[in-house]
Amino acid sequence: PPLSKLDKVINWELFREPIEKALYVEPKGAGGRPAFDKIMMFKILILQKYYNLSDEQTEFQINDRTSFKQFLNLKIGDKVPDEKTVWHFKEQLANKNVSQQLFNLFTEQLITQGIVAKEGSMIDASFVDVPRQRNSKDDNADIKKGAVPLDFAKKDKNGKMSKLFQKDTDARWMSKSGERHYGYKDHINADSKTKIITKYSVSSAAPHDSTEIENIVDETDNKLHADSAYRSKEIEEFLKELKCESFVHERGYRNNPLTDEQKESNNIKSKTRSRVEHIFGFMTNSMNDAL
């Protein structure tokens, strides 16, 4: 739904207590900059999920779009959280293991309000490109191993690991259809009727789309639409265990091409499944290409 409608049907104050409880720190006395409202920061994360935005793109779009400002109750001239502030808020929630809890609460409200009918689900994945980093050969070797380079962990004169804060050690390279991507993948489960995202997972850009299926599909899904990247014996068995009807596209192989019947079946399935591409298409065309 439009952001204005979403803003009306969601009781945002329900999120304040779990967020403030998770992020509470003992006050260190007067002084310092006032913190941004926690509900506004959470709404920024909802915008990121809705529009597949990186932290950098998020800051730009909030400054650029009137609809975003209205959704966040910001007036022209109000200070907007920068990309590092958005990243830090996300990291805090993730470290306290409350991100998924908050998103589930958000989805429950959409279902309660009748906006999401749960008549079927669509899954897909999309790249979220982030700025490419200039690291030394040794640093990149450590990052590929999943280790933090020693150079990143050095403390500055204030006792802080400022270089580590500025570096992204989780983003990865991936090539697809001749294009190189550096960053992450958003894996989403969206309601087939409204196209509202109800579950999500984030990985680096490197893993195959299907690797996150167990994190975005569960017993609440009764019908699943997906492209052939999600077609495998293991996934079909997984869906059967969940009692979820599979509408995953059939897959052809080099010596075993699709039959005419399978092609026709895929064409019928595409009428619903392609709606998930509309989500990513909208994200890409209306948001990222504006940068």
Question: What annotation goes with each model-predicted range?
Answer:
Residues 3-46, 50:
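Basic, short loop/linker segments at the boundary and entry of helix-turn-helix/winged-helix-like folds
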Residues 26-38, 51-91:
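Trp/Phe/Arg-rich N-terminal binding region typifying the photolyase-homology
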Residues 40-43, 209, 275, 279:
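Catalytic-loop motifs flanking and including active-site residues across diverse enzymes
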Residues 50-56, 134, 286-291:
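Short helix-capping/linker segments at secondary-structure and domain boundaries
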Residues 56, 60-63, 81-241:
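Polybasic low-complexity intrinsically disordered regions
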Residues 69-70, 196-200, 289-291:
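Short small-residue beta-strand/loop micro-motif enriched in glycine and branched aliphatics
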Residues 222, 228-291:
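Helix-centered, glycine/charged polyanion-binding patches within enzymatic domains
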